[in-house]
C-alpha cells in the first residue's frame, strides 16, 4: 500500500521546480481564475519559509506592497504556478525568517550570495 501511495505522489510532483531556499527572492507566476477567464498574476518577494515534503510541500513569500507587508503561501507542486523564477540568492542562517515581519526598510535587507 505504501509503494502505491509513493508512486501516485511521485507522478504528481512537478519536475520543473528550481532549487530555492529561505532568503531567496523569487517571482511566482500564479494562474488566477476570475469567472471564466484565467490570467497570470506575478508575486515577487522573499521566501520566508519552506515546509513539508513531497506533494504537500509549501513555501511562503513576503513582499511589501504600498507600505503594507503581504505574505502568500503556495504549494510547491501545484499546477496553479505557471512559472517560478529565482531572482537572487540570499544568505541567511535561519530556516524560518519570521523576524523580517518586525523589520522595516534597510534593516529588512538580506545579503546576496555572490
Swiss-Prot record:
Keywords: Ribonucleoprotein, Ribosomal protein. GO terms for biological process: translation. PROSITE patterns: RIBOSOMAL_L19. InterPro entries: Ribosomal_bL19 (IPR001857), Ribosomal_bL19_CS (IPR018257), Ribosomal_bL19_sf (IPR038657), Translation_prot_SH3-like_sf (IPR008991). SUPFAM superfamilies: Translation proteins SH3-like domain. GO terms for cellular component: cytosolic large ribosomal subunit. Pfam families: Ribosomal_L19. The keyword Transmembrane helix does not apply. Signal peptide: none annotated. One of its GO terms (molecular function) is structural constituent of ribosome. Coiled coil: none annotated. Belongs to the bacterial ribosomal protein bL19 family. PANTHER family: LARGE RIBOSOMAL SUBUNIT PROTEIN BL19M, RIBOSOMAL PROTEIN L19. NCBIfam families: rplS_bact. This is Large ribosomal subunit protein bL19. It comes from Listeria innocua serovar 6a (strain ATCC BAA-680 / CLIP 11262). The lineage of its organism: Bacteria, Bacillati, Bacillota, Bacilli, Bacillales.
